[in-house]
Amino acid sequence: MTSNPLEQLTIEQLQCRTSMKWRAHPEDVLPLWVAEMDVLLAPTVAEAVHRAVDNGDTGYPYGTTFAEAISEFASQRWQWHDLDVSRTAIVPDVMLGVVEMLRLITDRGDGVIVSPPVYPPFYAFVTHDGRRVLEAPLGRDGRLDLAALQDAFSRARRSSGPNGKVAYLLCNPHNPTGSVHTVAELHGVAELARRFGVRVISDEIHAPLVLSGARFTPYLSIPGAENAFALMSATKGWNLCGLKAAIAIAGREAAADLRRIPKEVSHGPSHLGIIAHTAAFRTGSSWLDALLQGLEANRALLRDLVTKHLPGVRYQRPQGTYLTWLDCRHLGFDEQINEGLAAISDLSGPARWFLDHSRVALTSGHAFGTGGVGHVRVNFATSQAILIEALSRMGRALVNFR
């Protein structure tokens, strides 16, 4: 049995890292913000990368082994047997892949719908590429609101004109709430998209990270989603943010669109990234299972710690990802929000307060769009010792504040 990957590194070892999570703040800050995990590489992934380096295998990526590995994993893990390698393309990472898919099916000025609170780059990447962001907010329960989606699709279609195109960015599982969309919810999305002529692009980067009590359903496996796209990667499941690679997958009716993707896009992924991601999907399942057990334990621990140390803060139990969404509005902290698009590193309200007063870094909810103000996102992919210390600090700061 593989040991818990989340309990293999000390804080002293983690503080030697040079990545964003551990370098963006001073050493006295405990970082529970950006979506990096505090783990070592899965052994089989490390072996594949070391072997490539030892052999000088550091050229350009080639072939379909990455797509084949994802197809095999999807078949075994999710019983999705229709991931046809001929309908895939390698892309540098999921968000750059999203932009490339939008360029295939929309034009500058067209509307792109998102469901906030949602991953901040959904706003930034879309806007910077000249598309208009429209919102279909999640419901009060943090799940997809099909009535809001219908209203947004209808408004977007009316405002787009007779020749306008409309797209919807689905986050499946959803970041930051950790909601894993049900088959019924995804059927609802597909039916509405067909009715209003909206093309769906599904960001499924967190797909391997679904915890007990929920089941991941690939959007492209839903009847009616044949003209959609999905983006997948091992980035989140195996902590490969610095080894970039992702796959764009087209539904049967979208295959011709995907074939129009510029050839130079395939030069963007790192060859070492593709080697690492392929190894993760092919040989990393036992490590992933051990990670999921560790995340299950941390999810339960975090619930207890919030109850103990943060009275008045509402904890929303995530079904997937290693992220949870805390409603801190009852604490009454002022929000000072700058104009314009917010970045994942921007701080306001409770996130700013907890950083200043408890030396714990969280992600500020305002960056996630409508419904995010007064919330924070917590990354619980770390050791239990760090979680306990972080929540204890936050609790002590609140006691002193009051």
From Swiss-Prot:
Pathway: Amino-acid biosynthesis; L-methionine biosynthesis via de novo pathway; L-homocysteine from L-cystathionine: step 1/1. The keyword Mitochondrion does not apply. Its EC number is 4.4.1.13. It comes from the Bacteria. GO terms for molecular function: cysteine-S-conjugate beta-lyase activity; pyridoxal phosphate binding. Keywords: Amino-acid biosynthesis, Lyase, Methionine biosynthesis, Pyridoxal phosphate. Its cofactor is pyridoxal 5'-phosphate. The modification N6-(pyridoxal phosphate)lysine is found at residue 236. It catalyses: L,L-cystathionine + H2O = L-homocysteine + pyruvate + NH4(+); an S-substituted L-cysteine + H2O = a thiol + pyruvate + NH4(+). GO terms for biological process: methionine biosynthetic process. InterPro entries: Aminotransferase_I/II_large, Class-II_PLP-Dep_Aminotrans, PyrdxlP-dep_Trfase, PyrdxlP-dep_Trfase_major, PyrdxlP-dep_Trfase_small. Pfam families: Aminotran_1_2 (PF00155). Belongs to the class-II pyridoxal-phosphate-dependent aminotransferase family. MalY/PatB cystathionine beta-lyase subfamily. This is Putative cystathionine beta-lyase. It comes from Mycobacterium leprae (strain TN).
